[in-house]
Amino acid sequence: MAVTDVFARRATLRRSLRLLADFRYEQRDPARFYRTLAADTAAMIGDLWLATHSEPPVGRTLLDVGGGPGYFATAFSDAGVGYIGVEPDPDEMHAAGPAFTGRPGMFVRASGMALPFADDSVDICLSSNVAEHVPRPWQLGTEMLRVTKPGGLVVLSYTVWLGPFGGHEMGLSHYLGGARAAARYVRKHGHPAKNNYGSSLFAVSAAEGLRWAAGTGAALAVFPRYHPRWAWWLTSVPVLREFLVSNLVLVLTP
């Protein structure tokens, strides 16, 4: 069975439209948006593990690189997965406020580019929408492979720069260029964007991710995270994928 066979059944147009509808709440109601995204991510990881191991990941240990305030911790703990979150930004760790005071799992403040974990120490290593926020995304990916046990899963998912959501809160102005979009945001709002081009947001292409994954010799699959199964072919078309694959998933096994 291919690693994506189970998840492909879940990757329907209805799912894609539901996630797209919730995207509009990311800024004004982040709890609603991230709970939906976390539940969908936990289901995706469960499907990928089931396809490769013929059983759900109950009792397995997952390291979430860039885990944020706890939405993902809750979703994975509810699925019976042991959760460890890594987050370098203390503001992000506490962004959800008192609602996550008693959040499940364990949290470590550290950089994804230098994970403070031993080699071969977790069953699953996930990074969701983080690679575009670090200056060396493939160093992050290499670290994820290092800490994952042989036969485990590494799932690195990131926002493609030239896709419609590449600019994050800068909107579509990133098509004018990252520096110009960042300056435009400052003029309009009086302060830099949280995801500020050149410091906390970087231009990461689909081609870069595909080259890195192929170069590791550990790649199992690549697919667009939010697209229905019938649109996955877009990842195989140069140039087109940069604009139409909004989020690329790289699945690897050490």
From Swiss-Prot:
Top EC group: transferase
Sample GO molecular function, one term: S-adenosylmethionine-dependent methyltransferase activity
Enzyme Commission designation: 2.1.1.-
Protein's UniProt keywords contain DNA-binding: no
Biological process terms in GO annotation: methylation
Cited Gene3D superfamilies: Vaccinia Virus protein VP39 (3.40.50.150)
Keyword Transferase in record: yes
Keywords, alphabetical: Methyltransferase, Transferase
Miscellaneous comment as given in the Swiss-Prot or TrEMBL entry: Was identified as a high-confidence drug target.
PANTHER family: 2-METHOXY-6-POLYPRENYL-1,4-BENZOQUINOL METHYLASE, MITOCHONDRIAL (PTHR43591:SF24), METHYLTRANSFERASE (PTHR43591)
Similarity comment: Belongs to the methyltransferase superfamily.
Protein name: Uncharacterized methyltransferase Rv0224c
Species the sequence originates in: Mycobacterium tuberculosis (strain ATCC 25618 / H37Rv)
